[in-house]
Curated annotation (Swiss-Prot):
Species of provenance: Coccidioides immitis (strain RS)
GO molecular function: DNA binding; protein heterodimerization activity; structural constituent of chromatin
InterPro entries found in the cross-reference section: Histone-fold (IPR009072), Histone_H2A (IPR002119), Histone_H2A/H2B/H3 (IPR007125), Histone_H2A_C (IPR032454)
Pfam families: Histone, Histone_H2A_C
CDD domains: HFD_H2A
UniProt similarity note: Belongs to the histone H2A family.
Annotated positions of the N6-acetyllysine modification: K5, K12
GO cellular component terms given for this protein: nucleosome; nucleus
Recorded name of the encoding gene: HTZ1
Keyword DNA-binding among UniProt keywords: yes
Region annotation (Disordered) ranges: 1-32
Subunit structure, interactors included: The nucleosome is a histone octamer containing two molecules each of H2A, H2B, H3 and H4 assembled in one H3-H4 heterotetramer and two H2A-H2B heterodimers. The octamer wraps approximately 147 bp of DNA. H2A or its variant H2A.Z forms a heterodimer with H2B. H2A.Z associates with the VPS72/SWC2 subunit of the SWR1 chromatin remodeling complex. Also interacts with RBP1/DNA-directed RNA polymerase II largest subunit.
Biased composition (Gly residues): 1-13
Keyword terms of this UniProt record: Acetylation, Chromosome, DNA-binding, Nucleosome core, Nucleus
Protein name, as recorded: Histone H2A.Z
Length: 138
């Protein structure tokens, strides 16, 4: 039926294996969004003497990376929302990571264009408050 209004002919459809079932990736089987196969390849290429890497190890590492990424993005999104902007910048990532104690200990790297955390030393703050009180009394 070329050119007609019917069922289209041809095309692969979903890829199938020899038994006729549709193929599912390791990521889909594990319910993950990050690519397990790619991370397994990175693990194999970056080990000494090209050591063997099990499939479950790659899935586990993928799940950990996906969880940490989701956690950081959620906190950075909250920081961006507090500042009433719609785009997450390195500043928001910095505020999110340094605001969470566990992420701060895990990620000790310097974030480019992240700025510094707003913090005033208590000793300086107390002197300013004392000056204000003395002016009010006088």
């Amino acid at each position: 039926m070329p050119g007609g209004k019917g069922k289209s002919v041809g095309g692969k459809g979903a890829p199938k294996d020899a038994s006729g079932k549709t193929q599912r990736s390791h990521s889909a089987k594990a319910g993950l969004q990050f690519p397990c196969g790619r991370i397994k390849r990175f693990l194999k290429n970056n080990t000494q003497n090209k050591m063997r890497v099990g499939a479950k190890a790659a899935v586990y590492v993928t799940a950990v990376l996906e969880y940490l990424t989701a956690e950081v993005l959620e906190l950075a999104g909250n920081a961006a929302k507090d500042l009433k902007v719609k785009r997450i910048t390195p500043r928001h990532l910095q505020l999110a990571i340094r605001g969470d104690e566990e992420l701060d200990t895990l990620i000790r790297a310097t974030i480019a264009f992240g700025g510094v955390l707003p913090r005033i030393n208590r000793a300086l703050l107390l002197k300013v408050e004392q000056k204000k009180k003395s002016k009010i009394e006088a």
